[in-house]
């Protein structure tokens, strides 16, 4: 079992990573140790994940003397919305839950982001715990306190920075994850190697097969390394005013794909993969990376069974309309996270539109 701490002074919290953590109530017991007897806990999940894991969590909570209840939400990116947020608020208000309630987000990135935002808003903030069940949420969205819902005009535009009290990652959950969802998570894993750790990227090139075979040692190492990197970055820049923006490699292009094609038609990680190729090509056109480095990025995404092409139905204008709504835009200027090598990246603001267009069009011919 691996244990990592996100160091944020009085808001620091642990990340526990290992196989079979759901079977051991000790992890929840440690987190809830300072709570009241008969502590009220709400587990929020979706209709796909709840039948697999909710009963285990509820049983553990009951063993600990908690008064636990379950809210099941619809499954899918399209439900990461204000309508579903209101459904959560109605459940909490109708249940007369007080400010000392603990909320557990049991699911993937949609559940984690939505439940985190609801926890930030309910009575101006209640404690919540992340129990991510997809690879993407385990390596990225459950760590760092970004919470949000989508708006038809943009992804994650309504949200808050709100840290969990703990993150519990059981790698056994990945055995029930469809391969397409697993691959979407691998896109975020690869991202960490590109922006921060060239040696980790090298390791991924050699070990993708082990990850897809759900090799426990390889999975634990990869997830822990991603969480270590994210914890280091978040500790330096919690509110994304500097280095944390590098974690958005591929996301400016990728969010445009998700918004234009409809949330859920491309999985988030699929859009990030395509967006990362466009960002890498932008870097190549600007002379920031070599042809060999560009090829390595494209090849690892292909090896991971991820899309590297630009969606045929999206024009340059479609991309720019959405990208100019990106949260990194400052004073009307588009800023892109661009790799400057394998293991490094920068936020760069002065990319000419003709280069961006060339990068987008490059993906049409791959």
Swiss-Prot record:
CDD domains per UniProt: DHQS (cd08195)
Record localization: Cytoplasm
One function term, GO molecular function aspect: nucleotide binding
Chain residues that bind Zn(2+): 188, 251, 268
UniProt keywords, alphabetically: Amino-acid biosynthesis, Aromatic amino acid biosynthesis, Cobalt, Cytoplasm, Lyase, Metal-binding, NAD, Nucleotide-binding, Zinc
Chain residues that bind NAD(+): 75-80, 109-113, 133-134, 146, 155, 173-176
Cofactor note: Binds 1 divalent metal cation per subunit. Can use either Co(2+) or Zn(2+).
Protein name as catalogued: 3-dehydroquinate synthase
């Amino acid at each position: 079992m691996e244990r990592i701490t996100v160091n944020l002074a009085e808001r620091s919290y642990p990340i526990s990573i290992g196989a079979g953590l759901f079977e051991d109530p000790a992890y929840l017991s440690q987190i809830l140790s300072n709570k009241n007897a008969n502590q009220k806990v709400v587990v929020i999940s979706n209709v796909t994940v709840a039948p697999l894991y909710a009963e285990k969590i509820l049983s553990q909570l009951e063993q600990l003397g908690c008064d636990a209840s379950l809210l099941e939400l619809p499954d899918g990116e399209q439900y990461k919305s204000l309508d579903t947020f209101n459904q959560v608020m109605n459940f909490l208000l109708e249940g007369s839950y007080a400010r000392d309630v603990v909320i557990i987000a049991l699911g993937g990135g949609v559940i984690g982001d939505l439940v985190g935002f609801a926890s930030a808003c309910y009575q101006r903030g209640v404690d919540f715990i992340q129990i991510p069940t997809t690879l993407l949420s385990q390596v990225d969205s459950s760590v760092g306190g970004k919470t949000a819902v989508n708006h038809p005009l943009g992804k994650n535009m309504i949200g808050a920075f709100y840290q969990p009290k703990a993150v519990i990652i059981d790698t056994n959950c990945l055995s029930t994850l469809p391969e397409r969802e697993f691959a979407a998570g691998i896109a975020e894993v690869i991202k960490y190697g590109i922006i921060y750790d060239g040696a980790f990227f090298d390791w991924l090139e050699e070990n993708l097969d082990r990850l897809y075979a759900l090799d426990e040692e390889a999975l634990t190492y990869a997830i822990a390394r991603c969480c270590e990197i994210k914890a280091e970055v978040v500790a330096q820049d919690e509110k994304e005013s500097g280095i944390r923006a590098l974690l958005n490699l591929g996301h400016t292009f990728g969010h445009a794909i998700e918004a234009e094609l409809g949330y859920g038609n491309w999985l988030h990680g699929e859009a990030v993969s395509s967006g990362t190729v466009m960002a890498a090509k932008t870097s190549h056109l600007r002379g920031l990376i070599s042809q060999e480095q560009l090829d390595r990025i494209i090849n690892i995404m292909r090896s991971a069974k991820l899309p590297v092409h630009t969606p045929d139905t999206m024009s340059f204008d479609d991309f720019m309309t959405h990208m100019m709504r990106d949260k990194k835009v400052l004073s009307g200027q588009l800023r892109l996270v661009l790799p400057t090598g394998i293991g490094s990246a920068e936020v760069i603001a002065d990319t000419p539109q003709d280069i961006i267009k060339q990068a987008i069009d490059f993906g049409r011919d791959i």
